[in-house]
């Protein structure tokens, strides 16, 4: 995000791990600071304790359990992996971290987690977390519809069950966040009915 920052050694630490461990992705830890009070919180702190995970089944399991970072920032991803799997952001689609991370987790075979803080997230009243409009609701609906396509196209029953659970959790979370941010019954109902 443009109002956040990476630590001076963020990229060098991630590159060193990626090259040493031969992984497709490295995720760093996040320090969250409330801008008005300078208070530090653990809003985006890594919850996973493993240093390296290999195998898509285990990676996807951890992702749908919520133990894998969802924000798109603070990740170093192998460019060839992104191109091979056509993992691109959709122009004009807002807040697609969940979509990008979900689609990455569907195919990711190796990841390392760096417990060092490599990203500083500044939480303030102008943060997207606190400011949502109808376009944001529309984008979340679009993202849920893309998840639904992955669900419909999935061949394996166990993974299909996991995708459905992820869709339900995603919808619950976005409805809750939208209510907290807007307290607009009409927009909330619009999102709920979609």
Each model region followed by its residue ranges:
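C-terminal subregions of glycosyltransferases and related glycan-biosynthesis enzymes
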Residues: 122-194
């Amino acid at each position: 995000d443009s109002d956040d920052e990476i630590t001076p050694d963020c990229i060098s630490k991630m590159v060193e791990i990626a090259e040493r461990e031969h992984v497709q992705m490295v995720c760093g830890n996040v320090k969250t600071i409330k801008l008005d009070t300078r208070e530090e919180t653990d809003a985006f702190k890594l919850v996973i304790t493993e240093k390296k995970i290999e195998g898509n089944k285990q990676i996807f399991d951890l992702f749908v359990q919520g133990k894998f970072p969802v924000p798109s920032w603070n990740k170093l991803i192998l460019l060839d992996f992104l191109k091979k799997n056509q993992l691109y952001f959709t122009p004009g689609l807002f807040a697609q971290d969940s979509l990008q991370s979900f689609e990455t987790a569907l195919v990711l075979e190796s990841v390392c987690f760096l417990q060092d803080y490599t990203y500083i997230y500044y939480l303030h009243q102008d943060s997207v977390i606190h400011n949502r409009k109808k376009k944001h609701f529309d984008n979340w609906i679009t993202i849920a519809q893309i998840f639904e396509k992955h669900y419909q196209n999935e061949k394996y029953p166990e993974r299909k069950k996991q995708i459905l659970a992820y869709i339900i959790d995603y919808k619950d979370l976005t409805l809750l966040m939208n209510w907290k941010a807007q307290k607009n019954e009409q927009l909330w109902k619009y999102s709920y009915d979609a």
